[in-house]
């Protein structure tokens, strides 16, 4: 017999006779093990909870009602801007810091690192510069709502770069944030996009699109544009990097580079009275006695200590004798040896020559920076061969511990050589690798209001050779560019010092050393003659809102349109008219709560009038310059049915207004009259009051109609 499902329902016990067993929660199912494992006793599974016999009551949905303006417009702000570009030897510069100043033809521009923010104010400034397009106007719409954005990054042909973004407040911009724009630091962070060049990924997409929502703490509600315009919607950073040669330049033997600077014992000083050589003699070149013109070189072993005495400024003959004596005993030896013992020379040296020859004694180098020992005076007439102290550096040996990078200003001294101001340090970073500290250091100092002519880069590091013990950075040809050359044939009869430096090194002089250290770091661009370009496209989605219908252009007679010479196209680009969000005052608009029984309240009218009277000059952003200079009439407002919410431009003083004022006086006087005594008098009083109110409503309607006719001439066709 074939089994079939019974069509009738099986019999069940009555409700009062049903037997209920204790309900237990079903155990969770588990997968069958796929491999053998060591068996162990599991903890017994416990069942929690109870079975409900009655269905749980459905919770009512709580409806949160939010104000929605009656007039709304969707707006998409789309723009295409340069993200990064830099010229030769500008890899460590900040893009926006090196872009605003007008450059000569041979000067470089841009930078290899950058950061920025997007806000409604920034987007409006870009609109004024012509970098983006707004799909809808925000005139007469003071409310704004933000829905997110899309960022499109385009792949470059030869350059690779990194883009990092965040929409999580708090947003901050400080020195640590700027040094974090180094490529190695950017690769280690999250929320980044690595855009490799087309040479490395020839078959990849040409662009990458990122969808970014509103900030994490921003509520999806309506804001006043005046309060919302300065809110940061997105913060980002970008930098170029070198994925092909990240650690050592192509063709180089090692990671060591050389930069130049001045040691701490030869600080120059700016002064109104002395040149650098006189400061060097009276304050810094110590170990020279005043007892005699003859001083042994043995006394120079402990030079520049606080116990030594100061000496006078040496003349030209003494310098020449010192040169010959130095060349005759140019034999390297340990620091503690009796160096050049017994050689008596007149050494009251106080100029650049001392700074040059001191390198041999303290660093065991060649006694003359331009060649072998025994250099003649003729060889010294070529300052282009002079160079400051050289320091070797490698990023692979820099551990960061004990490093110090800052900017310092020069102490000024009085006419007696006494220091009047201490050496000030600012923008200091400690215990970090030098290749990381120098990122955008020059532009950060300029952004903090530091004058580059009065400040210098200060470095202390144990990972250079020789050790950079409180040095001032300079470039290699600093001496050749800043030495006042002798214009006389005989240097002995010169009025000024042949080797006098007329200024101390500043931030601009230290940029070469900063660039060398930055390019030595990992993943930084290594080629000196390299350049780069990167492009970004963005689309921000907004909604404008308000209680008044925004203005729309009215059709005009085509036969009365103006005529232009040349091609038949209008002189304007057809962009939407945009108001500055920071100028949209909500007090200058009427709102639904400003009406009482179909009429505007006096306080609302007074508020709007005061707000409009406060604006003495029209906003520069209402209409762009040249929009109404071609004979076109200004856009007229469309007819609105119902009660108007526009402030009247004139105060009519006709019969209706006089009647309304008289009625206001009589109504106040009637309130003080006595109450009718008989029912007949009461009925007459009510009838007169009804007639007055009817007449009052008619006069108010005619008065409002006249005001609307003055504001909108189109209504004359509807109300003759």
From Swiss-Prot:
Family: Belongs to the anelloviridae capsid protein family.
Acidic residues: bias regions: 652-664
Protein name in the entry: Capsid protein
Location in or out of the cell: Virion
GO cellular component, one term: T=1 icosahedral viral capsid
Alphabetically ordered keywords of this record: Capsid protein, T=1 icosahedral capsid protein, Virion
Main location class: virion
Highest taxon above the source species: Viruses
Sequence segments annotated as region (Disordered): 546-569, 616-691
Keyword Plastid: no
One Pfam match: TT_ORF1
InterPro entries in alphabetical order: TTvirus_Unk
Protein role: Self-assembles to form an icosahedral capsid with a T=1 symmetry, about 30 nm in diameter, and consisting of 60 capsid proteins. The capsid encapsulates the genomic DNA. Capsid protein is involved in attachment and entry into the host cell.
């Amino acid at each position: 017999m074939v089994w079939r499902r019974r069509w009738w329902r099986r019999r069940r016990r009555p409700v009062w006779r049903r037997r209920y067993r204790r309900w237990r929660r079903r155990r969770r199912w588990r997968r069958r093990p796929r491999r053998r494992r060591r068996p162990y006793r599991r903890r017994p599974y416990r069942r929690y909870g109870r079975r409900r016999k009655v269905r749980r009551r459905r919770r009512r949905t709580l409806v949160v009602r939010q104000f929605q303006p009656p007039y709304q417009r969707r707006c998409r702000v789309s723009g295409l801007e340069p993200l990064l570009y830099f010229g030769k030897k500008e890899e460590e510069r900040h893009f926006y810091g090196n872009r605003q100043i007008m450059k000569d033809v041979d000067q470089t521009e841009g930078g290899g690192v950058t950061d920025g923010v997007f806000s409604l104010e920034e987007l409006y400034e870009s609109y004024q510069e012509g970098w983006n397009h707004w799909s809808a106007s925000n005139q007469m719409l003071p409310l704004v709502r933000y829905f997110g954005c899309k960022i499109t990054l385009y792949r470059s042909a030869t350059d690779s770069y990194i883009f990092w973004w965040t929409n999580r407040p708090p947003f901050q911009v400080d020195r640590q944030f700027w040094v974090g724009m180094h490529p190695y630091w950017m690769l280690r962070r999250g929320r980044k996009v690595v855009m490799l060049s087309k040479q490395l990924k020839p078959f990849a997409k040409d662009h990458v699109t990122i969808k970014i929502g509103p900030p994490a703490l921003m509520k999806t509600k309506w804001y006043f544009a005046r309060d919302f315009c300065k809110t940061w919607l997105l913060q980002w950073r970008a930098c170029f990097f070198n994925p092909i040669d990240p650690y050592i330049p192509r063709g180089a033997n090692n990671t060591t580079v050389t930069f130049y600077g001045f040691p701490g014992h030869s600080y120059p000083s700016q002064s109104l009275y002395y040149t650098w050589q006189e400061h060097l003699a009276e304050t810094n070149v110590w170990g020279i006695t005043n007892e005699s013109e003859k001083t042994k070189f043995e006394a120079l072993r402990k030079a520049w200590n606080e116990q030594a005495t100061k000496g006078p400024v040496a003349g030209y003959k003494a310098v020449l004798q010192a040169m010959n004596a130095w060349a005759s005993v140019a034999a390297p030896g340990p620091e503690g040896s009796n160096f050049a013992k017994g050689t008596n020379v007149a050494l009251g040296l106080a100029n650049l020559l001392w700074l040059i020859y001191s390198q041999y004694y303290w660093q065991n180098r060649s006694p003359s920076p331009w060649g072998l020992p025994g250099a003649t005076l003729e060889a010294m007439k070529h300052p282009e061969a002079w160079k400051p102290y050289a320091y070797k550096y490698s990023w692979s040996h820099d551990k960061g511990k004990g490093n110090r990078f800052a900017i310092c200003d020069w102490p000024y001294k009085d006419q007696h050589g006494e220091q009047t101001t201490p050496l000030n340090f600012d923008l200091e970073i400690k215990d970090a690798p030098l290749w990381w500290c120098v990122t955008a250091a020059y532009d950060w100092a300029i952004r903090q209001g530091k004058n580059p002519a009065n400040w210098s880069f200060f470095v202390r590091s144990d990972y250079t050779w020789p050790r950079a013990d409180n040095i001032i950075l300079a470039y290699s040809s600093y001496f050749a560019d800043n030495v006042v050359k002798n214009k006389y044939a005989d240097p002995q009869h010169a009025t000024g010092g042949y080797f006098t430096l007329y200024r101390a090194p500043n931030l601009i002089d230290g940029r070469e050393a900063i660039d060398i250290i930055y390019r030595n770091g990992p993943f930084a661009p290594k080629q000196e003659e390299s350049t780069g370009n990167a492009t970004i496209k963005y689309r921000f989605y907004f909604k404008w809102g308000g209680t008044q219908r925004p203005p729309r252009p009215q059709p005009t007679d085509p036969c009365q349109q103006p005529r232009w010479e040349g091609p038949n196209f209008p002189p304007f680009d057809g962009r939407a008219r945009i108001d500055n969000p920071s100028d949209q005052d909500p007090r200058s608009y009427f709102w639904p709560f400003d009406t009482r029984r179909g009429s505007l309240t006096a306080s609302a009218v007074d508020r709007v009038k005061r707000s409009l009277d406060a604006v003495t000059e029209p906003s520069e952003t209402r209409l762009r310059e040249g929009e109404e200079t071609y004979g076109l009439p200004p856009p007229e407002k469309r007819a609105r049915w119902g009660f108007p919410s526009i402030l009247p431009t004139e105060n009519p003083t006709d019969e209706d207004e006089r009647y309304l004022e008289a009625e206001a006086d009589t109504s106040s006087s009637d309130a003080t009259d006595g109450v009718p005594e008989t029912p007949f008098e009461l009925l007459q009083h009510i009838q007169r009051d009804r007639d007055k109110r009817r007449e009052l409503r008619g006069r108010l309607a005619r008065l409002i109609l006249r005001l609307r006719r003055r504001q909108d001439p189109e209504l004359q066709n509807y109300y003759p």
